[in-house]
């Protein structure tokens, strides 16, 4: 349920874009992200930092898109969010408090060096995706960018997540692997 809720704003953005335009879709994205927060709080009685940051970014860049009638802002939002994620991961690693380990370390027990590899892998992933987003957003058509944002980046993130889980699982002890089953 939680993962489906994460896709709610993206699905609404895409559907509204297909029937209307980028501006109405940007407004719908703001509303859908707010709705996501409300539903998440009602179901889980807490709000995740990532959702709050995403809502803030969507609100700021979506509002600028609407007020200034310039789709560049909503396009930049993707890259800026990815840059913030990359920075947060890098800083957490430098401070020896890796975010990914704190999120998944209880379920997936691996050595700290493996968490460092995973962290830097995700930093690189977010940087590359942010740069590719800039290229697609400002070199190709708006429709191509929307499709890339919705399908391309989502697929890349899912693939990256699966690769990360395989890598972590491969580096777990046999005893810890048995505990997961």
Curated annotation (Swiss-Prot):
Record localization: Cell inner membrane
Keywords, comma-separated and alphabetical: Cell inner membrane, Cell membrane, Membrane, Transmembrane, Transmembrane helix
Record's keyword annotation contains Ion transport: no
Keyword Transmembrane: yes
Membrane topology: Multi-pass membrane protein
A GO cellular component annotation in the UniProt record: plasma membrane
Main location: membrane
TM regions (residue ranges): 10-30, 50-70, 80-100, 118-138, 148-168
InterPro entries for the chain: YciB (IPR006008)
Entry's family note: Belongs to the YciB family.
Function field: Plays a role in cell envelope biogenesis, maintenance of cell envelope integrity and membrane homeostasis.
Name of this protein: Inner membrane-spanning protein YciB
Lineage, highest ranks first: Bacteria, Pseudomonadati, Pseudomonadota, Gammaproteobacteria, Alteromonadales
């Amino acid at each position: 349920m939680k993962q489906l809720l994460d896709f709610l704003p993206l699905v609404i953005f895409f559907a509204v874009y297909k029937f209307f335009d980028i501006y109405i879709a940007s407004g719908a994205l703001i509303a859908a992200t707010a709705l996501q927060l409300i539903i998440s709080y009602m179901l889980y009685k807490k709000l995740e930092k990532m959702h709050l940051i995403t809502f803030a970014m969507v609100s700021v860049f979506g509002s600028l898109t609407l007020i200034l009638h310039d789709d560049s802002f909503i396009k930049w939002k993707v890259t800026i969010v990815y840059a913030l994620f990359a920075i947060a991961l890098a800083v957490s690693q430098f401070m020896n408090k890796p975010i990914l380990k704190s999120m998944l370390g209880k379920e997936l027990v691996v050595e700290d060096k493996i968490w460092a590899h995973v962290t830097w892998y995700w930093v690189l992933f977010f940087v590359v995706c942010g740069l590719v987003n800039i290229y697609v957003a400002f070199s190709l058509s708006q429709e191509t960018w929307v499709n890339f944002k919705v399908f391309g980046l989502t697929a890349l993130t899912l693939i990256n997540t699966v690769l990360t889980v395989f890598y972590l699982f491969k580096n777990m002890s046999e005893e810890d692997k048995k505990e997961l089953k």
